[in-house]
Amino acid sequence: MKSMQYHPPTTTLVSEFNKEKYNNSNHYNDNNDNNNNNNNNNNDNNNNDNNNNNNNNNNSIINNESDNESNGTSNNYNDEANDNHHHHQDDEHHGNGNDNDNENYNNQNVNHEKLASIKNKNYNNNESDNESIEEINSNHNNDNNNNTNNNDNSSNNNNNNNNSNNNNNNNSKEINEDKENYNNCDQHHHNHNNNNNNKYNGGSSYNYNSKNCKEYINNLENLLKLSNKENKELYEKIISLGSILNEKKTLLSKYRNVLIDYLEDVHIYDENGNANPNYDNYNNTQQKSIKDFDVGKDLVKSNLNLQFHNYNNKDYNKEYNNNNNGNNNKDYNNNKEYNNINNNNISSNNNNNNNNNNNNNSSNKEYKEKEYKEKEYKEKEFKESKDSSLKRKSSSDDDGDDSGRDTKKYKPGRTVWTLEEEELYKEVFNHYGKNWKKIKTHFPDKSKSQVTSHGQYLIKINKLQDLQKVKSPPTLNITLNDIIEQLKQQQQQQQQQQQQQQQQQQQQQQQQQNNIVINNENTNDNNNHNNNNYNDNNNNSNNNNNFNNSNNNNTNKFIDEDDD
């Protein structure tokens, strides 16, 4: 007898089984008519019971087929129609009970071959059918007896199976072999499963996989929706960030232009504190673009000291000396290696000049000494001229305290003078003249230099007369509050005058409007009168014409009569 080949089901996956239960199970049941797939992962004793049940089910199927054939119905089945009824036993998981299991398996295969041969024939005699069915039933009973023997043997084999259950590596190999068998048989039994599904209206495992596919598709659709939402949000963020970047680029361009304008009058000194004359050839075209522009990269990190054209700075010489002694600073020594690196922002001309300066120290020293001496000479001249202008000449008109005294080097800023203070200043100046000390008593918030400079300014503008100083004048009891009240009164008077003027203007406008109305009425009356006269004249002319016509008619009548 030929042994039936095992065909694994294409609708179930090996990965769905648990490893431990799969290793302990020795029998599979693929019967689609009885939904026993959930019981495939039980112990050996339960699987043997399932085999008994399956054999009984096969007997019931055969009896049903015989009943259908006795009614005159003949069914033709293919050899592959009963592959879903095969029973598989793993001989590798049994120790000493392999012989009994193989006998049961061969007996079952014989029975299934007989079923296939019976179903492929058209029976005309019911008696021969019943005989063959009885033989098959007897064989199934033998199978049941053998299975009971297997139950006894399985209890002995459980001890041997403990080693296989503990070896996880062997189990994983067996599962991989089953997967390979599944992949090899998948294509071969694809059409076979379709035919069986058409006959038996589908199995539970097929429906189970279709549900899983639908759930998987729904999950994918949900993930697509979520990803689309996230993409939209990210796209909106990108747009907003792009607008912010554009705004910042415009601001950077503005700041860059401001810095360029501010750095036009700048001297940059080398590491040794010497000015670089070629850096004055500053060109905007040599600068970086807005993207590569960094405010603190060109000047701050390069440790180049800045000095503006401001000779009024008191600490100029100190800073210059400190720059010459820059090697003593810790920051300089730490950043010496960084300073030796060629900066990309400095032009190639400056790099060449620096190299020439290092090679020709003697010629450069002479040039630098001359330049430094010229700067010192200019600074001295400027300071002397400034000190001489700040010195005050002694005169008999000045007070004793201020005679021959050098004023402080005070740089007056822009002081704010209100209208009230200016009017008070005018009155005080007209009373005291150029006695600045007396004038300052009325302005405690202002300094003496501010008072004098403001008075001289007003004299230049011709808002004040150039009055001389009044000696020992009487004091004025005028304050800002008095002037504020005077100004308020003046403002009130001006407002009253403006109101009166507005009232007069309104009265004039009303009179003009009344005159216009009267003139319009007169013109309307005249026009009406003229129209009436015109109408009367037209009526008179019409009457005259009618009279003339009547006369003409009468004359014509007389003429006609005469002719007759």
From Swiss-Prot:
The keyword Nucleus applies. Residues 23-79, 97-107, 135-173, 193-203, 310-364, 519-556 have a biased composition (Low complexity). The keyword Glycosyltransferase does not apply. Residues 22-107, 122-203, 310-410, 519-564 are annotated as: Disordered. One of its GO terms (molecular function) is transcription coactivator activity. Its main location: nucleus. PROSITE patterns: SANT (PS51293). GO terms for biological process: positive regulation of transcription by RNA polymerase II. Pfam families: Myb_DNA-binding (PF00249). GO terms for cellular component: mediator complex. It is found in: Nucleus. Keywords: Nucleus. It comes from the Eukaryota. Residues 412-464 form the SANT domain. Residues 82-96, 365-409 have a biased composition (Basic and acidic residues). This is Myb-like protein F. It comes from Dictyostelium discoideum. The gene is mybF.
